[in-house]
Swiss-Prot record:
This is Histone H2A type 3. The modification N-acetylserine is found at residue 2. Deiminated on Arg-4 in granulocytes upon calcium entry. Monoubiquitination of Lys-120 (H2AK119Ub) by RING1, TRIM37 and RNF2/RING2 complex gives a specific tag for epigenetic transcriptional repression and participates in X chromosome inactivation of female mammals. It is involved in the initiation of both imprinted and random X inactivation. Ubiquitinated H2A is enriched in inactive X chromosome chromatin. Ubiquitination of H2A functions downstream of methylation of 'Lys-27' of histone H3 (H3K27me). H2AK119Ub by RNF2/RING2 can also be induced by ultraviolet and may be involved in DNA repair. There is a cross-link at residues 14, 16, 120 (Glycyl lysine isopeptide (Lys-Gly) (interchain with G-Cter in ubiquitin)). Keywords: Acetylation, Chromosome, Citrullination, DNA-binding, Hydroxylation, Isopeptide bond, Methylation, Nucleosome core, Nucleus, Phosphoprotein, Ubl conjugation. Residues 7-19 have a biased composition (Basic residues). The modification N6-glutaryllysine is found at residues 96, 119-120, 126. The nucleosome is a histone octamer containing two molecules each of H2A, H2B, H3 and H4 assembled in one H3-H4 heterotetramer and two H2A-H2B heterodimers. The octamer wraps approximately 147 bp of DNA. The modification Phosphothreonine is found at residue 121.
């Protein structure tokens, strides 16, 4: 009965991406390919791209969360580079991680030196003499 093809065999399971198996949005397969092609080492373990994709996804989510808050504070619904800059520079750990990074169209943090501010004078509501 040759030539009849597969009849009683198991149906092949629907393909499931490594990203969905790991519960991630970032592409594990693409990260794995980039690790292999990037000449970082001769061999790349199966867990390394999953871990790296998870770290990248976490950092991205953290930055976007803070940038979204900055956009909302400025009464905007769209995140622009300025909001990313404000989010990163106002967060101590992200600022340290991305300290040498320049964000195009990001601007600078508003900062006025204390010595340039007008001096505070005593209030005019002093009790007058007898």
């Amino acid at each position: 009965m040759s030539g009849r093809g597969k009849q009683g065999g198991k149906a092949r399971a629907k393909a499931k991406s490594r990203s969905s198996r790991a519960g991630l949005q970032f592409p594990v397969g693409r990260v794995h390919r980039l690790l292999r092609k990037g000449n970082y080492s001769e061999r790349v373990g199966a867990g390394a791209p999953v871990y790296l994709a998870a770290v990248l996804e976490y950092l991205t989510a953290e930055i976007l969360e803070l940038a979204g808050n900055a956009a909302r504070d400025n009464k905007k619904t769209r995140i622009i580079p300025r909001h990313l800059q404000l989010a990163i520079r106002n967060d101590e750990e992200l600022n340290k991680l991305l300290g040498r990074v320049t964000i195009a169209q990001g601007g600078v943090l508003p900062n006025i030196q204390a010595v340039l501010l007008p001096k505070k004078t005593e209030s005019h509501h002093k009790a007058k003499g007898k």
